[in-house]
């Protein structure tokens, strides 16, 4: 049976995800509805992607009995309301990262999903790329020995993009780019809670974080660090080092196709998406997370074993603590 998707928001990321679903077997994935706050945009999106239903409100999509799972592709500050709306209507939910602007928002969504017995997952698509799965397998086999340190960098000049510098929309580097770095460090260290977090950073003139460097100390004397920036070009690589060697995820580390493990270079081609155009780098790789959601739902799972809800809560806690350390608050923090 095909998994029936409803797309919440007709923006660029939603377009890429819908394009990807169209490359997968129709017997497994079908997009049955799209909603935008402007009906004309929803209709235009539906025409482009050949979707049977277009709604001018998220409420209408949530009420559509044909929708099994909702993909939330709105801006960060709108995630919570959209997720809670879809959960209240009995839908499974895949929500773009970051799930919430702060830890309180994430906890509220997680509690709602658990109380209703519904599937909820944060769309950290990176974790489903074969290059990352290969690294995880190597770590679990002890290929790198005892782990000591992990590091990640993600930075580009996004200051010309209004959303990236918009304080009201919780812009800045941490929530958009830093989450990729911290999820990598959290992944290689097994989702442990850091014992100590220290951060330094500069703010952009609008009040969002511009460039931030973070040091995380974990139990057992291991540590991770990352730098993220919306104004500086960084290496956009990630690595983990142990007593027997180093594993490197090459640029683009947030959607990687290359892994160097103890000097051995491995390539993992993207899934085929002939004649398809994407708005974001390696957009075809969204297929991996879509397949994972279907597998979880077919097994009757309420959360992903790869991105468990407790880890989504932990990532939100860490990001919030970093923001406090560098003095960045958003309007959503006072609600």
From Swiss-Prot:
Q: Which Pfam families match?
A: GFO_IDH_MocA (PF01408), GFO_IDH_MocA_C3 (PF22725)
Q: What class of enzyme is it?
A: oxidoreductase
Q: Name one GO molecular function term.
A: nucleotide binding
Which tissues is this chain's protein expressed in? Liver and kidney.
Query: From which domain of life does this come?
Result: Eukaryota
Which biological process, per GO, is one annotated for this protein? D-xylose catabolic process
| Site (May play an important role for the adaptation of the alcohol substrate into the binding site): residue numbering on this chain | 176
Q: How is the activity of this protein regulated?
A: Strongly inhibited by isoascorbic acid, 4-hydroxyacetophenone and 4-chloromercuriphenylsulphonate. Stimulated by various salts.
Q: Which UniProt keywords apply?
A: NADP, Oxidoreductase
The UniProt entry, under SUPFAM superfamilies, shows: Glyceraldehyde-3-phosphate dehydrogenase-like, C-terminal domain, NAD(P)-binding Rossmann-fold domains
Q: What reaction is this protein's catalytic activity?
A: (1R,2R)-1,2-dihydrobenzene-1,2-diol + NADP(+) = catechol + NADPH + H(+); D-xylose + NADP(+) = D-xylono-1,5-lactone + NADPH + H(+)
Q: Does the keyword rRNA-binding apply?
A: no
Show which residues form the site (May play an important role in catalytic activity): 180
EC number(s) on record? 1.3.1.20, 1.1.1.179
Q: Which residues does the annotation list for site: May play an important role in coenzyme binding?
A: 71, 79, 97
Q: Which family does it belong to?
A: Belongs to the Gfo/Idh/MocA family.
Q: Which PANTHER family match?
A: OXIDOREDUCTASES (PTHR22604), TRANS-1,2-DIHYDROBENZENE-1,2-DIOL DEHYDROGENASE (PTHR22604:SF105)
What assembly does the database describe for this protein? Homodimer.
Q: What is this protein called?
A: Trans-1,2-dihydrobenzene-1,2-diol dehydrogenase
Report the source organism: Canis lupus familiaris
The gene name reads: DHDH
């Amino acid at each position: 049976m095909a998994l029936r998707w409803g797309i919440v928001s007709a923006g660029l990321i939603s377009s890429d995800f819908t394009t990807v679903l169209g490359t997968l077997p129709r017997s497994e994935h079908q997009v049955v509805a799209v909603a935008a706050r402007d009906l004309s945009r929803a209709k235009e999106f539906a025409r482009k992607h050949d979707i049977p239903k277009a709604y001018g409100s998220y409420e209408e999509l949530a009420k559509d009995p044909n929708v099994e799972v909702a993909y939330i592709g709105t801006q960060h500050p709108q995630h919570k309301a959209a997720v809670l709306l879809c959960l209240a209507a009995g839908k499974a939910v895949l929500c773009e990262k970051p799930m919430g602007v702060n830890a309180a928002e994430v906890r509220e969504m997680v509690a709602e999903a658990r109380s209703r017995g519904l599937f909820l997952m944060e769309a950290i698509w990176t974790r489903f790329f074969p290059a990352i799965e290969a690294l995880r397998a190597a770590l679990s086999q002890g290929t790198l020995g005892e782990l000591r340190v992990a590091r990640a960098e993600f930075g580009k000049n996004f200051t010309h993009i209004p959303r990236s510098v918009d304080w009201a929309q919780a812009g800045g580097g941490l929530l958009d780019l830093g989450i990729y770095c911290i999820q990598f460090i959290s992944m290689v260290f097994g989702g442990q809670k850091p014992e100590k977090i220290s951060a330094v950073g500069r703010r952009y003139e609008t009040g969002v974080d511009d460039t931030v460097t973070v040091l995380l100390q974990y139990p057992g004397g291991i540590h991770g660090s990352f730098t993220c920036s919306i104004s500086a070009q960084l290496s956009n690589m990630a690595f983990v080092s142990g007593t027997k060697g180093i594993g490197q995820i090459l640029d683009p580390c947030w959607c990687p196709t290359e892994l160097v493990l103890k000097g051995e270079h491995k390539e993992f081609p993207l899934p085929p998406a002939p004649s398809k155009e994407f708005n974001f780098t390696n957009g075809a790789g969204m297929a991996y997370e879509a397949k994972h959601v279907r597998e979880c739902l077919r097994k009757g799972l309420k959360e992903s074993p790869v991105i468990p809800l407790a880890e989504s809560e932990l990532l939100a806690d860490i990001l919030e603590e970093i923001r406090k350390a560098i003095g960045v608050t958003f309007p959503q923090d006072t609600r």
